[in-house]
Amino acid sequence: MDEGDLEAIVRGYSGSGDAFSGESSGTFSPSFCLPMETSSFYEPEMETSGLDELGELYKPFYPFSTQTILTSSVSLPEDSKPFRDDKKQRSHGCLLSNGSRADHIRISESKSKKSKKNQQKRVVEQVKEENLLSDAWAWRKYGQKPIKGSPYPRSYYRCSSSKGCLARKQVERNPQNPEKFTITYTNEHNHELPTRRNSLAGSTRAKTSQPKPTLTKKSEKEVVSSPTSNPMIPSADESSVAVQEMSVAETSTHQAAGAIEGRRLSNGLPSDLMSGSGTFPSFTGDFDELLNSQEFFSGYLWNY
């Protein structure tokens, strides 16, 4: 296409645009104009006024009015303030859990414990030492500790008749009057009085006495017999008896050796050197003859 053709096309489009603009700029005919006030057209103002009247008629039957809804929506932030404040207080308490908050909790716990202790029934009695065992209830000692300002310790007992019994008692000597004891009873027994009371309950039991060993003589030897002794472990009495037996055996051995040696010497000595029994040598003759005797020097005496 040439440039002239393009210009003609552009001019044609511009002319049609001008014609359309001229037509649009002209006034419309009255036949095309819509009437402003007609009875057949929709009027929204009248409809809205009718809805308002119906709303006013049904307003008493509504569960919530618009005013209450508005006030509730407005009051929500105000109601949420205490909740937020409570949250702040809780978080503040958590932050101070290792400080004043914890102290406050401990104080409340100690107060509750003190109130429980005050509610427990306590009975204090002053008795003498000989009346300590006159108590009809069975007790078992479970502790003892020193008391500040008193040279005497305090003993703690619990009821031994029943495991679930909460009865307790404390016994301590009165520092002002050492002849008396202060007994403090706490709580009551939840069972009947025991018919038989173990008198050794709460006290240290003495060791059972063992029967004394009996001594029996067999072939002139003392033998110790004890029912409770272990046969594998020798007792002190048995060891002493063994020592005595050894000494007796050694004595008899020496006597036998002396008798044998005496018989051997008597075979090589003259009759003047022998005693009447013939067991031990003895000098009964002349000493000069003994020295001149050749048998004396050649006998067994000098070899012995």
UniProtKB/Swiss-Prot annotation:
Signal peptide extent: none
Cellular component, GO annotation: nucleus
Entries under SMART domains matching the protein: WRKY (SM00774)
Induction context: Induced 30 minutes after flagellin treatment.
Region (Disordered): 76-96, 185-236
UniProtKB keywords: Activator, DNA-binding, Nucleus, Plant defense, Transcription, Transcription regulation
Record-given protein name: Probable WRKY transcription factor 29
Keyword Transcription regulation: yes
Pfam families according to UniProt: WRKY
Gene Ontology MF: a single term: transcription cis-regulatory region binding
Function: Transcription factor involved in the expression of defense genes in innate immune response of plants. Interacts specifically with the W box (5'-(T)TGAC[CT]-3'), a frequently occurring elicitor-responsive cis-acting element. Activates WRKY 22, SIRK and its own promoters.
Gene3D superfamilies linked: WRKY domain (2.20.25.80)
Biased composition (Basic and acidic residues): 78-88
Assigned protein family: Belongs to the WRKY group II-e family.
Entry's Gene Ontology BP terms: defense response
Domain of life per record: Eukaryota
Keyword presence, Membrane: no
Chief subcellular location: nucleus
Ranges of the DNA-binding region feature: 128-194
Further comment found in the protein's record: Acts downstream a MAPK cascade and therefore might be regulated by phosphorylation. WRKY 22 and WRKY 29 may provide redundant functions.
PANTHER family according to UniProt: WRKY TRANSCRIPTION FACTOR 29-RELATED, WRKY TRANSCRIPTION FACTOR 30-RELATED-RELATED
InterPro entries: WRKY_dom, WRKY_dom_sf, WRKY_plant
Biased composition (Polar residues): 196-213, 225-236
Subcellular location: Nucleus
